[in-house]
Amino acid sequence: MKTKLLSTLIALLSLTMNVFGQAKKPTLMILPSDNWCEQRFFMTEFDNQGTKQKVPNYKQVFQEDVEIGQVISKIGSVMIDRGFPLKDAEQELKSIEARKAEDNMTSSTTSGSSISESPLDKLQNKAKADIVIQIWWKVNKTEQGKSVSFILEAFDAYTSKRIASSTGNGTPNNTDIIPVLLQNAILANIDPFAAQLQSHFDDMFNNGREVLLTVKKWNSWDKNLETEIDGKEITDYVNEWLQKNTVKGRFNMSSATENIIRFEQVRIPLFDANNNSIDARQFAKGLQKYFKAAPFNFEVKLMTRGLGEAIIVIGEK
């Protein structure tokens, strides 16, 4: 009897350890901060539908800076030691350059209306990391030797919201190279930072990933979002679909007119039935299919900006 009870307890303990050992960790991607790139003139202009914006030129960073590869490798090893899977930004950039099959510019085949994405949007779409970590550092010279000051910030790759940060200064010495000085400085401050990352991901795991969703109409369409179908406005159908398909029915309609509806804090599942990550595009495909079927039979265009914003446009494709 005791032997059987002991065997049962061991089996339960083993199962419990296995469950905790398989706890999901967010996938990370490490990049230099915008400010670091600006200070070193690694910037380029991006034409955002007629508006010029300065954005980091990550390709140039990895090609020309002698320290960034080592720095990212050192920080990456610190995060991997804590169980976080990592996406290699440099390799993802090379993959984007190698393919160049499309320029990530989407347009209506009827009217030519378009939506553009920044280089970071394209990189995040390719890598599909959950969290982007940005690093800034500066080398200080003291009587005791060189030291580094650093700022480590983490952003939700889907919403661009800051979710964790850490700052600090390393111990001066004249023997270690900059990447090692930086690694040691970060190690002394990393545990609270890692805890913030895990807390954010745990919230997503329980309450869904946050994305943005916009539903709008083409100007050429003969209906609008207040048009009634079988006694209900199109806007009402959108709300009902979101109630059924978001996690715990959580979303916020921030604005609604006859031409456009904007939803914020739309909580979508992290994974599908096959345990693959779901982004805003995959989620919005369900709404696209919904409106393409009876009783609507609409032409529907699906566009995205980055991983976390989907735009459904009704009336053309």
Predicted regions, residues:
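C-terminal basic regulatory modules in eukaryotic proteins
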Residues: 286-317
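Extracytoplasmic
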Residues: 23-25, 66, 70, 74, ...
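Amphipathic beta-strand/beta-sheet edge segments enriched in Tyr/Trp
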Residues: 131-175, 305-317
